From Swiss-Prot:
UniProt-annotated location(s): Cell membrane; Synapse, Synaptosome
Annotated GO MF terms: syntaxin binding
Annotated region described as Disordered, given as residue ranges: 104-135
Organism of derivation: Mus musculus
Annotated site, (Microbial infection) Cleavage, chain positions: 185-186, 202-203
Outcome of swapping residue 119 to A: Inhibits interaction with ZDHHC13 and ZDHHC17
Post-translational events: (Microbial infection) Targeted and hydrolyzed by C.botulinum neurotoxin type A (BoNT/A, botA) which hydrolyzes the 202-Thr-|-Arg-203 bond; the in vitro reaction is not highly efficient.
Covalent lipid adducts (S-palmitoyl cysteine), residues: 79-80, 83, 85, 87
Protein name: Synaptosomal-associated protein 23
Length: 210
């Protein structure tokens, strides 16, 4: 650089500025793509959470229907005049340990407690959180023109998007953990419902054969 004329130094400064500007544009483009991917992922997680809620509600409805079916079987036994020996009485399914462990009091296991996290810091796909730039800005100004203004703006947007990506990652992690717990609960409810249905079928067959 010492051997360059002032004109050549100025030309080189403009070349470096142009290259730096293009770099910040590429970085911003990649950051926006990453943010869009994050928003789509959170949207899909939210839709998946709604599906899990519907499935769990279905499990709860089956449980209620089976309660009514068991009452009907008991009434049919009485109507048919069947004398049931105390030792052969069917134990109330809901008094069992497995049932209580699965349904409990409906507190922490209810679908309403599985909260779907939304990207609270994202609005219409645009970064809403601003992170403080370094004192004096992100770049050291050389040409002090519109190109450096754009570079500063690009890097400011990148910083904001990075903050959003961090928050989205936390939201996704929390949502995935909550959904994994809900899937486990749905599996337990499905198993309990199956056992309850099997027991009811056995009672019905005995009633028919009697």
């Amino acid at each position: 650089m010492d051997n360059l004329s002032p004109e050549e130094v100025q030309l080189r400064a403009h070349q470096v500025t142009d290259e730096s500007l293009e770099s910040t544009r590429r970085i911003l483009g990649l950051a926006i793509e990453s943010q869009d991917a994050g928003i789509k992922t959170i949207t899909m997680l939210d839709e998946q959470g709604e599906q899990l809620n519907r499935i769990e509600e279905g499990m709860d409805q089956i449980n209620k229907d089976m309660r009514e079916a068991e009452k009907t079987l008991t009434e049919l036994n009485k109507c048919c005049g069947l004398c049931i020996c105390p030792c052969n009485r069917t134990k109330n399914f809901e008094s069992g340990k497995n049932y209580k462990a699965t349904w409990g009091d409906g507190g922490d296991n209810s679908p309403s407690n599985v909260v779907s996290k939304q990207p609270s810091r994202i609005t219409n796909g645009q970064p809403q959180q601003t992170t403080g730039a370094a004192s004096g800005g992100y770049i050291k100004r050389i040409t002090n023109d519109a190109r450096e203004d754009e570079m500063e703006e690009n890097l400011t947007q990148v910083g904001s998007i990075l903050g959003n990506l961090k928050n989205m990652a936390l939201d996704m992690g929390n949502e995935i953990d909550a959904q994994n717990q809900q899937i486990q609960k749905i599996t337990e409810k499905a198993d309990t419902n199956k056992n309850r249905i099997d027991i009811a079928n056995t009672r019905a067959k005995k009633l028919i054969d009697s």
